Amino acid sequence: MTLYSAALLLTTKLGPDGRHHRRHSTVGRGFHLQTAGVHHPNSGRSKYEVQVIAFSSELAIVSLPGEIFVELGLALKKASPFPHTFIAELANGSIGYVPNRSAYAEGNYEVVSARCAEGSGEMVVEGAVKLLKELR
């Protein structure tokens, strides 16, 4: 099964909170793919899909649709249960910059142009780590 065909198998469900939750898990030639995404229709929130792929008990890739700040990437790698965790940015689309919480006080270009609220970056890290732990 190709990564593309695995991604096409995603299902959509309406959760108890009224949000659409998509989650799929599959195993293919030497990898395990876990995908989760949340989208709240008519809320002004953006869809953000986090995808993790484990190739072994030692190696995982996290794909994110945006450019996360380095502090978030380092936090994700540190919290990952996989010794070798790689992050692919701008995967499955892009929502632009995803700053860490402390960057909002600085007001630099990336923060001003970001389409996500303060604290969103930390939520992305928490979600990715949760998915990684499910695979481990």
Question: Which positions does each model-derived feature cover?
Answer:
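Non-catalytic substrate/cofactor recognition surfaces at enzyme active-site rims
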Residues: 1-136
